[in-house]
């Protein structure tokens, strides 16, 4: 992995020297290409415009280094490292057999079928090529290689040289934690739940619901002993007072069942955009950044909006006028 990192840094340094004062414009175009706001052909045209004819190879070498770095992260196993290289217990450690140059050459160069890598012609929808392959369209989390490529572009834009694997792992964990917080805020608005220590939510949608017509129903839920404080015991064991006695737990369960209603809560429909909108409006602390919060709320409101019949007709007329100007015929 260190070899590919050094190759990427060397390619970046060579490209920066070739660009000179145009390096900021190149990073901006690279960011637009990663966001798929411009095509690969447009990005290559802008790169050739910023570079001289003798330095165009620096652009190709840099892109090849980035793609190689991201591809190595995807193809490498998750648990590869120093832990896997340790010798297994119970097996004698033998001498490592040194392979000859002939064996290495035969292993690397194997005869292949030239038609194996040929492109297969499959009938596709013409609109599929115009779709952006972003997370909002694929409905899936970005892969490790895609995320590192995006982080490398952002790091180069802010003057950093490289991105470590630990930083990519931290961003992936932070993304998963953020999505879990969003789901918790939405589910907590749909179904009842209990609190532990005043902040930890659990038991979402439990079958035992309180009976509002009983006077002691609310008190039974408020006085529920979940984690009693540690009590000093004469034996000196610290864990003797950290658990609830089975008789007390059975009495609490019987009281909750007696104070609960006869009917189970009705099943709810699947989570929709209205639930997400309500969850973010109530729990605004889930997205601390005001800019990100405002953009996401705008996207949610746009998803909830649908054009009426008149707007659809006006849009069709506008498309026909554009097609007439370009000399195209609509079917």
Swiss-Prot record:
Listed Basic residues bias regions: 90-99
InterPro entries xrefs: Hfi1/Tada1
Compartment(s): Nucleus
Principal location listed in the UniProt entry: nucleus
Keywords noted in UniProt: Nucleus, Transcription, Transcription regulation
Protein name: Transcriptional adapter 1
Molecular-function annotations in GO: transcription coactivator activity
Coiled coil ranges: none
Family to which this protein belongs: Belongs to the TADA1 family.
Spans annotated as Disordered: 81-102
BP GO terms, sorted: regulation of transcription by RNA polymerase II
Function: Probably involved in transcriptional regulation.
Cellular-component GO terms for this entry: nucleus; SAGA complex
